[in-house]
Amino acid sequence: MLDFLELEETVGRAWHRLIGKTGSWPQYPDHAVQLVDIRQRLAICFRGFGGDIAVQIAPARARTSTHRLGLRQRMALGEEKLAQPLRDEATLMLPPEIALFPDRQLNYDLYVWLVGYMAVMPMDADALPEDALRRDLAALQIAEQTVERACRAFPGLKPRYKRLCAAILAERPKRPLHRLEQQVEARILSLLKQGADLPDDALPTIFPHRGPAGYLPALPVPLWPGLMKREEVAPRTGEDEPVRNSQSEGAETGRQIAQRERQDPRHADRSPFILNRFEKILAMAEMVSVDRPSDGSDEQNAKSADELDDLTLGERKGRPAARFRFDLDLPPEAVDRSLLTAELTYPEWDYRKGAYLPNHCAVLAAPVQEKEKPLELDAAAQSLVRRVRRQFEILRPGREVLRAQLDGTDLDLDAVVRSRCDLAAGGQGSDRVHLMSRPQANDLAVTLLVDVSLSTDAWVDNRRVLDVEKEALLVLANGIAACGDRCSILTFTSRRRSWVRVETVKDFDESFGPTVEHRIAALKPGFYTRMGAAMRHATAKLAEQPNRKKLLLLLTDGKPNDVDHYEGRFALEDSRRAAGEVRAKGVNVFAVTVDREASAYLPALFGRGGYALVANLAKLPVALPAIYRMLAG
């Protein structure tokens, strides 16, 4: 009863009731649809609508919308962030949640419509004008054309779009706007009424060439996604530049330093006059190219970055000057003594240009260093090895019996009887009356390509990913040795296109034994996952094998990526192209992954039946031999 005496609490509750919910669009949480729940269905819809298989679906980030706010909104927020649907060449960015309508089915229909709209969205459209008014009008024109294209291509979407337009008209807020903004709003309502098949009595409007001062963009319509243009960037090379030493051998004279500074473009705009505001000095000091310790935490920086609408990344023009330089005296055991067996180059597919980048990746082939002791297996793993060997021994080819031979270890009774009958009938007998047996030839060659990137050093369910991969690899290698198939084992990791390291654990002509077990135990995490170059290199030798059937079995824990431009859709398209090249050479390719999110991208790389997902990491040693038996059979 005395709560009103708590002045701060009373004022706070009143303030919350007044402006607590000031969003432009109403929200109905009880009827919300989450993107994470229907992401796979939407991906299938997008492929069915003709969308590119390598385009991924991701949640859209809330961005600041600069439309005109009401008084309560300005008091509460000052700005409004909306998770607007967007699309670029590689990603469909959809709202993480849609609760716009008081009908769950309508919220779901909006997701389906957005996917169909984005499937036919023109990706080669010109950039929108800088002027806010012209940008709004151009966006409305693109939306009208794209809606017409989507309804013509997919007639089943037209009734859904009609219902959505009617629902948007009912939910779109009525706000006080300036005269020109009201005219743009009338144009938006006219397009919505046209989509809902409602009468529209709005008169045509002639808009000025440019928007006046104070004009603010219209409130975005959730039915019409936007297009995000991303500039194509070249691979960065700044990290490869040598460090400049300020006290290098042979100190520069004053004349040389002056000449170097005159030629350096970074010093060309220096002036003795200071015409800038002094508040800029602190910001300029942060951009000086010197090494400094980091004061902020990574978590704090990540939160600050999430609050930005756009994050621009820049490069330093050269490395910072080093005060001194020295070489570390590494102990002998820290030196990598493994010899390179080859340094080869392979092309890389650039989906933007629709062409290969010739000799773009350098692959360093080397043997794996052996470890002094083999991998230690517990009792359960040792029992699994024995069981897998027994299962694989059944797959070992038996001996085939050849009948009616000139020579052999036994008589072919059928051939003997047939020969005697021919002689008794006055004909000519045959000398091919023997049986001969010989072992059936193995007709399968397989290469196990194992991803040993840095992500395999992660721990899942109290076990390191690489340790489980080693155990699964050892179990499968024992089984393959038991059935007699020809097998090679390769590992791969990368660090830029100039350093893709592929190491040989076992070659085709090498028998499985303690040496191979020691090499498996010696595997250690590397860097990144340039999958396309590794697959091309592994297939080059596999395709040369004389066996009729060939299999490339890829074991990985994540999607392809590298520290340079090799990420996102570029990496997916190159890996998909590499998988197609593997199949074109008569080699079957199959991927096994422990990444629980792999179903979002592996179908695009290897096809619907070209991969297996082992969600439980602990079951990998059991699942991998079973997958191999299925493929080999």
UniProtKB/Swiss-Prot annotation:
Provide the transmembrane region boundaries.
none
Per UniProt, the ranges with Basic and acidic residues bias are 232-243, 258-270, 292-306
SUPFAM superfamilies linked: vWA-like
**Domain spans labelled VWFA:** 445-631
**What are the protein's UniProt keywords?**
Virulence
List the Pfam families: VWA
Q: Does the keyword Heme apply?
A: no
Show which residues constitute the signal peptide: none
Protein origin, superkingdom? Bacteria
Would I find Ribosomal protein among this entry's keywords? no
Region of interest (Disordered), residue spans:
232-270, 290-313
Function noted in UniProt: Part of the operon norEFCBQD encoding nitric oxide reductase. Essential virulence factor, probably involved in the detoxification of nitric oxide (NO) produced in the macrophages during the innate response against infection.
Name the UniProt record assigns to this protein: Protein NorD
